[in-house]
UniProtKB/Swiss-Prot annotation:
PANTHER family: PROTEIN TRICHOME BIREFRINGENCE-LIKE 39 (PTHR32285:SF71), PROTEIN TRICHOME BIREFRINGENCE-LIKE 9-RELATED (PTHR32285)
Protein name, UniProt field: Protein trichome birefringence-like 39
Organism of provenance: Arabidopsis thaliana
Purpose: May act as a bridging protein that binds pectin and other cell wall polysaccharides. Probably involved in maintaining esterification of pectins. May be involved in the specific O-acetylation of cell wall polymers.
Gene that encodes it: TBL39
Position of sequence motif DCXHWCLPGXXDXWN motif: 343-357
Molecular function terms, GO-annotated: O-acetyltransferase activity
Renumbered ranges of motif GDS motif: 120-122
Lineage of the organism: Eukaryota, Viridiplantae, Streptophyta, Embryophyta, Tracheophyta
Length: 367
């Protein structure tokens, strides 16, 4: 004996009403469940995300470089002819847990109305553009405003009011032009006024501290009231980072601003660092595999570690040095736009800086 609704319009109305209600409810529950899953994934990250190994993953890279409008030519290795693809496919796998997956919508919703500023040299540019591409891959049709000025760039995702800023500074401490010439002031950080009022700050410095001769951007270093034609670069780095730490202690309100420091990014100009003394990063197609990187821990890392331990305000140290040392294959090398020579200090995009941002994302939302 069958059941029929023929001739009963009120039944049809309530049937379709409850059907629609169930569909909407299922959608809401699904969205809520997805957000809950992201939260659980982030909250579960109670391990050392910075110790692990690189694994090949066919699902990588996390975005298409041809569809991201923010990549500078010097980082867009595929566009400028890099023939191999394996360097795009490596995912960082921590030893005792899994690194949370990046969710661009979750990031935008959690950071709605906030300002995130990267402060540092061209490696900060590397990381800023990476984060912009990661987010854009989730909302490719959303409206954005990109403004580039000398020393400062900002990218705003309009619908969410999220702004990614980049403040370019080679040393964090001040570099001024005076009567005697260009003076690197190891105990002055007046430019820090530009960093105040941010919701998140991500700092970086080291790359330029080692430059000499014609690529050295200063003529004198100033410490106190004394000028120096030069000094041990590690000593200078320590003095500069100590000045930065004093600025953090004096001006950062942890209830309003989260502070990160992206650690020392290694170079791969010297093949002896990984047991190939005749080579550099050029033509490298695989990461270094081994229990310990032969090049050892950079002294800059030791200095940065010392400075971090003396901070009175909370700063999240993204300790990317060890995992980045393994990626001798991930540099632009000869595929760096119109930049001549062999670039073994910056990184291809997509590439290693995406992992830096996964670590930033994981730390930001689990802290």
């Amino acid at each position: 004996m069958g059941f029929t609704s023929r001739g009963n319009p009120s039944f049809l109305f309530f049937f379709f009403f409850f059907l629609c209600l169930s569909t909407v409810s299922a959608y809401i529950n699904s969205t809520s469940s997805n957000n809950d899953e992201v939260r659980r994934e982030l909250a579960s990250g109670r391990c050392n995300w910075f110790r692990g190994n690189w694994v090949y993953d066919v699902k990588y890279p996390l975005y298409d470089p041809y569809k991201c409008p923010f990549i500078d030519p010097q980082f867009n290795c595929k566009k400028y002819g890099r023939p191999d693809n394996a360097y795009l496919k490596y995912r960082w796998q921590p030893s005792s847990c899994s690194l949370p997956r990046f969710n661009g919508l979750y990031f935008l919703r959690r950071m709605r109305g906030k300002k995130i500023m990267f402060v540092g040299d061209s490696l900060s540019t590397n990381m800023w553009q990476s984060l912009a591409c990661l987010i854009h891959s989730w909302v490719p049709n959303t409206r954005y405003t990109l403004i580039r000025q000398k020393g400062l760039a900002s990218l705003t995702f309009e619908e969410y009011g999220v702004t990614l800023l980049l403040y370019r500074t080679q040393f964090l401490v001040d570099l001024n032009v005076e009567k005697v010439g260009r003076v690197l002031k190891l105990d002055s950080i007046k430019q820090g006024n530009m960093w105040r009022g941010m919701d998140v700050l991500i700092f970086n410095s080291w790359h330029w501290w080692t430059h000499t001769e014609h690529i050295q951007p200063w003529d004198y270093m100033e410490d106190g009231n004394r000028l120096y034609k030069d000094m041990n670069r590690l000593v200078a780095f320590y003095k500069g980072m100590t000045t930065w730490a004093r600025w953090v202690n004096a001006y950062v309100d942890p209830s309003k601003t989260k502070v990160f420091f992206n650690g020392v990014s290694p170079t791969h100009y010297e093949g002896k660092d990984w047991g190939e003394p005749m080579n550099s990063c050029r033509s490298q197609t695989q990461p270094f595999y081994g229990r310990k990187y032969p090049g050892g821990t950079p002294m800059a890392w030791v200095i940065l570690n010392k400075v971090m331990r003396r901070l009175k305000k909370p700063v999240h140290w993204l300790d990317i040095t060890g995992l980045s040392q393994l990626r001798k294959d991930a540099h632009p090398s000869a595929f760096s736009g119109n930049h001549p020579g062999n670039d073994c200090s910056h990184w291809c995009l997509p590439g290693l800086p995406d992992t830096w941002n996964l670590l930033f994302y994981s730390t930001l939302f689990s802290s």
